[in-house]
Amino acid sequence: MASGADSKGDDLSTAILKQKNRPNRLIVDEAINEDNSVVSLSQPKMDELQLFRGDTVLLKGKKRREAVCIVLSDDTCSDEKIRMNRVVRNNLRVRLGDVISIQPCPDVKYGKRIHVLPIDDTVEGITGNLFEVYLKPYFLEAYRPIRKGDIFLVRGGMRAVEFKVVETDPSPYCIVAPDTVIHCEGEPIKREDEEESLNEVGYDDIGGCRKQLAQIKEMVELPLRHPALFKAIGVKPPRGILLYGPPGTGKTLIARAVANETGAFFFLINGPEIMSKLAGESESNLRKAFEEAEKNAPAIIFIDELDAIAPKREKTHGEVERRIVSQLLTLMDGLKQRAHVIVMAATNRPNSIDPALRRFGRFDREVDIGIPDATGRLEILQIHTKNMKLADDVDLEQVANETHGHVGADLAALCSEAALQAIRKKMDLIDLEDETIDAEVMNSLAVTMDDFRWALSQSNPSALRETVVEVPQVTWEDIGGLEDVKRELQELVQYPVEHPDKFLKFGMTPSKGVLFYGPPGCGKTLLAKAIANECQANFISIKGPELLTMWFGESEANVREIFDKARQAAPCVLFFDELDSIAKARGGNIGDGGGAADRVINQILTEMDGMSTKKNVFIIGATNRPDIIDPAILRPGRLDQLIYIPLPDEKSRVAILKANLRKSPVAKDVDLEFLAKMTNGFSGADLTEICQRACKLAIRESIESEIRRERERQTNPSAMEVEEDDPVPEIRRDHFEEAMRFARRSVSDNDIRKYEMFAQTLQQSRGFGSFRFPSGNQGGAGPSQGSGGGTGGSVYTEDNDDDLYG
């Protein structure tokens, strides 16, 4: 099966490569010759394409842009490259390294007349005749080919002026001969208008959704450009495409790019703008939009925020919305078979759209524009930083790996935040009163990796703005002891994120959940925070009681929402603190307002089962009452690993004390080992409290000595001239001794016995400590039919076990 798929993939890729290797597709390189009308190829390539020196060629760039130039040979140019200067590159909307196509264009006629206008900011302050100084010397005896819409740069006098070709006769391209009439009357063209067309979005400006973009191209470009294909095969081309996904992933951007690249007429309908208070006007607005598009075919109608104008009819109370939905349905059915009109729509709430719109023949294709993965994020970052001045230490790959759950809009915000931070650093060198900024300051501006790190600390994914998602600042060093638990946790969360290939190799899906149980104050919450930080996953902390609300059905909706958010921001750790408050055993909650708690548990169970294996969402529960939790949650496949976090032993207590005091100045003679020995039965929280109290006593003493010294200085100023040492430079033994007088255990022996019992019963009910396969049976993977009573059975069946299933 796999080999068939592989060979199919290979055939496809070789076909694509062959297509890419067409001889007339060349890579753009920097020109040596600065002439605006000349491109250079190597002599072998010119021979291959049957071109001669001085031939006119048509170049095709991006966004359906074309240019006509004269071709010359250049010995220094390699065969697969074409040399062109910046003016030609801008006209073709390409950069160095992009691919363009070239073809002979022998039938370019001499122009009768052309109309060119300068760009306003390049002619400011120029007096004199533009034609005499600039245009006449530029075109004289040059026989330059030009195309309508081209911008060209002319150097003359002391300045360089940019001109735009507004009109040519014959259109769209011609050669400017000696008898061509050149008009240059009229208002100069505004730079802003020009910039807008330059900044049109193309496929290059979209990152992170290659697969979806390929799908959309196929569904939009083929019907618009080659409708005959569908006619030949005898099917109807797709009519409508629905783009859905979280906000900020680039749905509107994709629609604009498709329109620019296909050159189709683009009609934008912003959902809410269609609405009108007059009866019947909203529907007529829709009808007008479709009529306009049919007139200007090929056309793309793009409806943004579709859910605003086409909600489910049974759920809306307004008559207007229902009529608009019906009107949209009839319009989409009424589109003529080959009207070359495609309707695209975008929404981030696909489930609130009327189902009649989502059938075949209307919005028959739905494309999920999801949250990008690490490679997608890197593409997006490269697009947003291509015009930014980056320092050498900026590692965009690292930034991409650390921005889990960020969509394109978040990454754009991140880049601008990093740039602002770079400017902030130089603010003291910038005088806001001055009109101009010193050139040295401008040149020294560059965005460094530190600026990106700062921006990262300030930003979190927009999908998770409501549920505060923090990647906690807790590391493994903050947690003393619990080495086995740490390793277990790393295997659970870090392996699936960092080594997904291993799980594929062994053919198993990673486990999804863990339950920590144990006495209070042993670091259950701290562990969950540390694991989220260590593998750079997003972290959503859910306090159990917050989920429950007074409204019927609201609590379950809260659970659904949280799981949806976690899936969007994957990899994500969902941490349920105090799980026993929302997952009590069902049936025992009498009088809790219609069994709300039971329904919440049911919702959590179904959500845990519905976690798709591709999304790295991990659930960690923490409780100190494991005995009252519903057993269905504890089965394998949900919270399948139950980890007992006991009170720390002596070695762990030393580690906890060291972790707590690692940033504090402690006197050399404070024996932490002895302190750990004396605090048997203390939890991590109790030990932290001892450290805090000792620290507080040291601070108190320090403040008192400063006050005393201040008084002495006031009474006897001359005696206090000499600078004294800090009277309390560190936390001393007596501080710890004083703190130990107030120390108390928060967990009684009785409580510990309960936990130990629960852990033991779990171990017995789950583990087969003495299980071994029988040595004689080396056969197949499954047990043989007749081995019921042989040696195989006696390995793990003990004599005193009652066989409840016999």
Swiss-Prot record:
Mutagenesis or variant effect for E578Q: Does not inhibit interaction with RHBDD1. Increased interaction with CAV1 and UBXN6. Impaired autophagic function. Defect in ubiquitin-dependent protein degradation by the proteasome
Residue ranges, annotated region (Disordered): 708-727, 768-806
E.C. code: 3.6.4.6
Gene3D superfamilies linked to this entry: 1.10.8.60, 2.40.40.20, 3.10.330.10, 6.10.20.150, P-loop containing nucleotide triphosphate hydrolases
Enzyme class: hydrolase
Keywords: Acetylation, Amyotrophic lateral sclerosis, ATP-binding, Autophagy, Charcot-Marie-Tooth disease, Cytoplasm, Disease variant, DNA damage, DNA repair, Endoplasmic reticulum, Hydrolase, Isopeptide bond, Lipid-binding, Methylation, Neurodegeneration, Neuropathy, Nucleotide-binding, Nucleus, Phosphoprotein, Transport, Ubl conjugation, Ubl conjugation pathway
Motif (PIM motif): 802-806
Outcome recorded upon mutating G318A: Does not affect methylation by VCPKMT
Modified positions (Phosphoserine) in chain numbering: S3, S7, S13, S37, S462, S702, S770, S775, S787
Covalent crosslink: Glycyl lysine isopeptide (Lys-Gly) (interchain with G-Cter in SUMO2): K8, K18
Chain positions with N6,N6,N6-trimethyllysine modification: K315
Phosphothreonine PTM sites in chain numbering: T436
Region of interest (Interaction with UBXN6), residue spans: 797-806
Mutagenesis / variant outcome for changing K524Q: Impairs ERAD degradation of HMGCR
Annotated phenotype, changing R155S: In IBMPFD1; impaired autophagic function
Phenotype upon changing K251Q: Impairs ERAD degradation of HMGCR and does not inhibit interaction with RHBDD1
Localization per record: Cytoplasm, Cytosol; Endoplasmic reticulum; Nucleus; Cytoplasm, Stress granule
Medical condition linked: Inclusion body myopathy with early-onset Paget disease with or without frontotemporal dementia 1: An autosomal dominant disease characterized by disabling muscle weakness clinically resembling to limb girdle muscular dystrophy, osteolytic bone lesions consistent with Paget disease, and premature frontotemporal dementia. Clinical features show incomplete penetrance.
Family assignment from sequence similarity: Belongs to the AAA ATPase family.
PANTHER family in alphabetical order: AAA-FAMILY ATPASE, TRANSITIONAL ENDOPLASMIC RETICULUM ATPASE
Role played: Necessary for the fragmentation of Golgi stacks during mitosis and for their reassembly after mitosis. Involved in the formation of the transitional endoplasmic reticulum (tER). The transfer of membranes from the endoplasmic reticulum to the Golgi apparatus occurs via 50-70 nm transition vesicles which derive from part-rough, part-smooth transitional elements of the endoplasmic reticulum (tER). Vesicle budding from the tER is an ATP-dependent process.
Protein name: Transitional endoplasmic reticulum ATPase
Gene encoding the protein: VCP
